């Protein structure tokens, strides 16, 4: 049987068992990662899995069942079991469950890829990490680490509404970090971010990062941080680099606009949300420079796809427009509860997990400035970049972030390097203070977004650029 035949058999079995709606996903995923430390290969991981996951809706209740077997008998049994779980749950009825309509697509989609990352010889990939980490050690790092990761995923999706979709998504990326120790301090510098850069692309992304070319600089900067002055405490103008702003978006916007959190359906890992649907369309989230979109169509970004795991097509939507909150991340059922006309943001971490609302590419639209112009316009402030620590409350409201590095900004010039820079604030007040935003957008990839019970790891993208925020508390000590 083909993968589509397996999924179709599961859906039909669920319908025969009483489901009013059913869908099934066959997923085949290959994963590879390699890490190096101090000029030597540390670990190689290669994994492959394939299986079937089935959802069934009976009354107001969902059921789910997954199996690592693609026979017709296993598929039919999975469909029946998903329907049986939903039927049992429906004995204690909850609120009605409706699904926002979507076109019944019959389609194929694939992410862009110039160089198949799994086709690159292991020796070449390992040599890259060995040379990069070895160079960092030669330039003074006490600990030099490098990593790449690759995911190669094919999905086949069938629904009782007529969907028949296959997608092939390649994701890869990597990065390096240098850690130096001395005088009671431990300092780290990373490239291109503290966890690397990732996208729905091929090995060409890793090549473009030039890990070896940046290795000496970040090792030397990690040592320089050991003797740099501490970031001063107080209120000042804060300039954030794009990588740090990407995490700020992830934590204080992305999770907050997940509709399942807003409705109180989900609280694991990141709590619920301070947002209230009665204020959708009217709440002032940030300054007029703040334009945030939900856009899974960005070529090469980590949160991109052709269709989500409910068969909804990838569509760009506004989340915040000119500072006003106007959109959410939603699934078909949560959107119906909220009276919205769209889903499109539901994905699962593999065939054995139930699809849930996840971030896609949630990020800022470009501003009118450059980083140099922002620095030139700042009389007294601090520039910070690359995340080191994060803390945010269970409403996604109060936060404190630490960065790897800071620089003093005085009279329009970047000055001394600062160590242990931190800043704190309250989400909407912080975003309302943004008064300059660069046009230099990069879709930063986050491959480790945790959510759900049992836990799932999502891959998300966050287009971001340097920006300035006024009168921010910095240098906060724990």
Residue map of PLM features:
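N-terminal small-residue-enriched
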Residues: 1-478
